[in-house]
């Protein structure tokens, strides 16, 4: 039906409804609805337009055209009707209400009221406009009157200014005459006048601007407004509001002409007038008003020449006033009174004031210069003031006065001071007397010259400044640096340096982005560092070279290059960097690179321009990068286009100081790390600590008293006496040894007969030696040394030191075999080995068999020889240690014997006479030197001359040198004389050959006729050489004797389950040994594990009793024991034919589910009527259906894709998840997992849950599998998920598959990824992944606000079978990123092998179906592993970046940058659910077909067209099953009502009790708060019904507040 109603008066029709052939017809704007009535209105207007009845109808406020002959109109409250009869038209203005329904009548009356309100508003507006026009006319008249008044005042002002100018001119002439007279007067008293004139000018220069007056006629201060001074200074112009604020007053403020822009002021004034008065722009009245206002505000302008005249005249006037004032004061001597009063006030105590006041009165009476008395009252002590008064009264007795003062002051100082302050008191007295002399002479001079008081003050200040201030400024101070160096610096230099430093700070503070400051070049501080995998940049700091850790890549040796110098150096140490995956490597600075200049640390680290000093790709020519760098959380970010090989380069600031180190680039972002705090902590803090300790020791040393020093001297004297006694005892032993050796040489034959007896008595002698050593240990330290030497020499002669007690045990006892012997024992013959290979045993299996055989052989050996496994079987190492010690003793004794005149021990000993002609021995500390000569008799005389030259006359300490000459029967022995070993040279005259052997001892052999030889041997041994000869322990590197087995055990590195890393007992645990639940501390890991399992278990609700022992795991229940249950299979049951089936394992599990669950508790509620969803049921076909996702489409290999887009996705994904950097490996016993889940096959044959398994068997299997590093495959148990699905999916047997495996495998993955997963749950507000988010408390609104953008559209996408279609290559890539984000200390080869094994078993899976079939599934992310959702989020982010780059490339023919993606897009994701916001300026249109094809062809992933939706706004989008809508200005969620309420009629599981039913209903009510009233009322009704039944049954339920459901959604 055609219907229309007129709209409000003045409204216009929408453009979409305007006729195409012309403008809108008059009267059409009164129609309520134009749909279908335009033609009707045209027809009626054409037919009745001139009729009075039609005109009456058109005078109504609202018109309703009912048909071509009838219309109804409403005016005010009357309803009239228009009709067309055969005889004409009629209009009845009232009584037509019966022709309308109540709703239509109400609607038309509302429209009429609206029109009336609009009419009233127009009338009110017209009245206001008329009143404004009248006010404007009155304002215009007032302005005219104001202009007339201003003109009159202006005339009066001009006359007044002219008169004032004339008076001012006359006043100036009078002042000039007065000034001329003053100058004449000054010439007569030149000294006084000149001094006074200088003071006047100085004073006037200071106060000129404070007392400046405007006396010029043109520049007189205005009564109202500002005074404008002509100036060309470059100052910003004032706005109209500034001029109003400054000049709209009577203060006479000054403004410069350059601040006044007349055109701008007029324009701003007119705009302000338009704003306040409400008229249109360009009103002539406003223009005139603004011109008058500006003239009023700025009435007077002055030139700079006029200001100079003002300055001169005011200065002269001020000088005259001050001069007259001073004359008055001087005439009445008021200056002296003021000075004396000031002097009296300076008295520091009553005694001094009493003594100063008489002096002041005397000085006033005698006309003494006041300044001198003031000085005397300040600098002189009270005791010398009487001499000052005497000098004032009797100035002619100065020498006598000074003499008496000198005697008095010195005597008084001597007798009144104690011994400590005597020197100070006498010095002070002498200084006082000298000051008295100088002061007396100054008073006489001032009185003779009659210098005015002002000149006296200035003269005193100038003298004090020059003598004290300048001298102090140029004085030299001594600065002692921490390294002990001293430096003398003048104070002026310090001030200059301080000013330079301040200027540098100001310069640095003015650094702004966009202006690159200049900086020094620090290329002289960098070198090239080459490691195993590449090269980088190194730089010097202090006395080391530093570079980045990834440059070295674990190399122990690196090559340093600088220009033509190349040195291979060993890495000193690796320093960990806080929150950084890289490290800092320290390399020692060699002497070849001492010329490299060190860098100094920056004083301030902030966003600024930094310089990166590096090399070009050729690593020869140096390059510099400079630009703005941002410092954030200890990292440096910039956009430098760095090259390969720039890693490790230093960042320096504008002063050339070190800020940080370059790590690398990701895309267009270069990244570095700040090193200031690290280097301060590692180096400067240690040096400061050493300096502090040194200073403490120095201070402590200064506290030693004189008595303590004397005590120390007495103790040292006692030691000297003891040393003398020891030396005498040693000399006595030497003489006894000499006699003993002679006796031994005569009885060699007897010794040969007694050898057998000595061997038999060897054990007795060793026991005797042990008792002797015990007695020696009880002796005082001073006698122990001598006794030890005696015993060792004695035993050496007897040949007993070769066997200690322990060595004897090894020699006489049975020699046992070690376990290492059995570990290398051959257990299989060649035939047995070949047979095992033919039978199909793998090399690993054969090795396992051999190891078991070797272990059994070792156990049999222990049993046969009655040896305990814990006995000390390291006898071989201990025996070697004993032999080493014995050899060391032998070497020391032989050296002592040789240096005392004997050869090394042999069967027959010879004296020097038998062996050598000359033997020189020098035994100085740290330098032992011997020279021996063997020659033929014919050259003995020549060597005798050399001997006499070698022995000098200088005396040495007793026992430090021996010189022996043995020729025939004559022997010369000279002791304790300086010996020059260089004088002994071989005599080569007549020699056929001369050969030298420069080894550890330099030997020269001269061969003569008949092969006769002369031998000269020189040997030098130092303490360093002796130290190098010591043998070290192969485990710890120490030379001291100790238990090698214990040392090896403590240094063996083993994997620690608590720390998650490999370390030894010496290194200690990296984590505190505290219980994770109660924080109790423990001494070792075993105690803590026992406590965690038995007393304070975190994983078990009911832990075992403390006395309980865990049972060993039965055979066949281990993680890899499923292979023993595998049987051959004959045919496929549920697995498709294209899937490989490995075998069959019989299991008793549900295969089909055909019946639904019936819950009796649900009879208490009314069912929700829907026919879309139901609980999942399936047949055996469902297992065949679930394999379809693995064969949807084959993905491309990543090698076929452009590496640029792959790198872009990788870089974005790493930056997105950089908060995981440095994540930790959680100990496997501390991982958190659902204990009530199935333990998988084969464990579920015995244990229903992991909780039951842990309570029975404990953690042993977890630790073993982690430690051994398995390579076998675990078995995945597959079952179908029971959930609510669409009935269409249930009919198609399209049920989701869940995979779970052995809990040991799951917790290994949890150890690597649990910490990262928990970090992702904390970052939902600022990152894409939403694991752990909540839609409540404004959660949806905050994410909607984050996604919202003015030019954005929104894409909702949901993949089909997302988990199963993830390409294996992409999944490995994601897992590699997760391993990369671990802390570097966990990235060991062992952990990498464990993680790779874990990842490969996630991809290449062996799966057991409920039908018993065991098959292989390759690819995808199993939907039951520990990190399924987190891994899916990683994949989602990576794919989204790839998708955006793909669409962007299609539109712009280039790839976007990471910054562009972050700026123009944002999204949130949860597993396979994603909501994307894209700016139209980034990607204009979202091509859904291209996206679907891209995912299928590139990745083999399934995206259905129905699962991609594009929205222009956030209203109606869905995420995680909730549709977003607005309520009270905030976004909230609406769930899928039919799906969640279907469980009230068709549940997937039974509820345990009525409380659970009530809780389920409350949860559903909470989710449906934003739904329609029908849903809310239904749930409220069910909750009330259940609550009533619970109350009748006596069950108490919680109470819920009235606003609980609504307020929980809003933030």
From Swiss-Prot:
<dbReference type="GO" id="GO:0005524">
    <property type="term" value="F:ATP binding"/>
</dbReference>
<feature type="coiled-coil region">
    <location>
        <begin position="124"/>
        <end position="187"/>
    </location>
</feature>
<feature type="active site" description="Charge relay system; for serine protease activity">
    <location>
        <position position="647"/>
    </location>
</feature>
<dbReference type="GO" id="GO:0003723">
    <property type="term" value="F:RNA binding"/>
</dbReference>
<feature type="transmembrane region" description="Helical">
    <location>
        <begin position="329"/>
        <end position="348"/>
    </location>
</feature>
<dbReference type="InterPro" id="IPR009003">
    <property type="entry name" value="Peptidase_S1_PA"/>
</dbReference>
<feature type="transmembrane region" description="Helical">
    <location>
        <begin position="195"/>
        <end position="215"/>
    </location>
</feature>
<feature type="transmembrane region" description="Helical">
    <location>
        <begin position="426"/>
        <end position="446"/>
    </location>
</feature>
<dbReference type="GO" id="GO:0075523">
    <property type="term" value="P:viral translational frameshifting"/>
</dbReference>
<keyword id="KW-0472">Membrane</keyword>
<dbReference type="GO" id="GO:0008236">
    <property type="term" value="F:serine-type peptidase activity"/>
</dbReference>
<feature type="site" description="Cleavage">
    <location>
        <begin position="508"/>
        <end position="509"/>
    </location>
</feature>
<feature type="site" description="Cleavage">
    <location>
        <begin position="168"/>
        <end position="169"/>
    </location>
</feature>
<dbReference type="GO" id="GO:0003968">
    <property type="term" value="F:RNA-directed RNA polymerase activity"/>
</dbReference>
<dbReference type="GO" id="GO:0006508">
    <property type="term" value="P:proteolysis"/>
</dbReference>
<feature type="transmembrane region" description="Helical">
    <location>
        <begin position="375"/>
        <end position="395"/>
    </location>
</feature>
<dbReference type="InterPro" id="IPR043128">
    <property type="entry name" value="Rev_trsase/Diguanyl_cyclase"/>
</dbReference>
<feature type="active site" description="Charge relay system; for serine protease activity">
    <location>
        <position position="582"/>
    </location>
</feature>
<keyword id="KW-0696">RNA-directed RNA polymerase</keyword>
<feature type="site" description="Cleavage">
    <location>
        <begin position="1027"/>
        <end position="1028"/>
    </location>
</feature>
<dbReference type="InterPro" id="IPR043502">
    <property type="entry name" value="DNA/RNA_pol_sf"/>
</dbReference>
<keyword id="KW-0067">ATP-binding</keyword>
<feature type="transmembrane region" description="Helical">
    <location>
        <begin position="353"/>
        <end position="373"/>
    </location>
</feature>
<keyword id="KW-0547">Nucleotide-binding</keyword>
<keyword id="KW-0597">Phosphoprotein</keyword>
<keyword id="KW-0378">Hydrolase</keyword>
<dbReference type="GO" id="GO:0039694">
    <property type="term" value="P:viral RNA genome replication"/>
</dbReference>
<feature type="modified residue" description="O-(5'-phospho-RNA)-tyrosine">
    <location>
        <position position="833"/>
    </location>
</feature>
<dbReference type="InterPro" id="IPR045836">
    <property type="entry name" value="Astro_VPg"/>
</dbReference>
<dbReference type="Pfam" id="PF19416">
    <property type="entry name" value="Astro_VPg"/>
</dbReference>
<keyword id="KW-1043">Host membrane</keyword>
<dbReference type="InterPro" id="IPR001205">
    <property type="entry name" value="RNA-dir_pol_C"/>
</dbReference>
<feature type="active site" description="Charge relay system; for serine protease activity">
    <location>
        <position position="550"/>
    </location>
</feature>
<dbReference type="InterPro" id="IPR043504">
    <property type="entry name" value="Peptidase_S1_PA_chymotrypsin"/>
</dbReference>
<keyword id="KW-0720">Serine protease</keyword>
<feature type="domain" description="RdRp catalytic">
    <location>
        <begin position="1352"/>
        <end position="1486"/>
    </location>
</feature>
<dbReference type="GO" id="GO:0006351">
    <property type="term" value="P:DNA-templated transcription"/>
</dbReference>
<protein>
    <recommendedName>
        <fullName>Non-structural polyprotein 1AB</fullName>
        <ecNumber>3.4.21.-</ecNumber>
        <ecNumber>2.7.7.48</ecNumber>
    </recommendedName>
</protein>
<feature type="site" description="Cleavage">
    <location>
        <begin position="915"/>
        <end position="916"/>
    </location>
</feature>
<keyword id="KW-0808">Transferase</keyword>
<dbReference type="GO" id="GO:0033644">
    <property type="term" value="C:host cell membrane"/>
</dbReference>
<keyword id="KW-0812">Transmembrane</keyword>
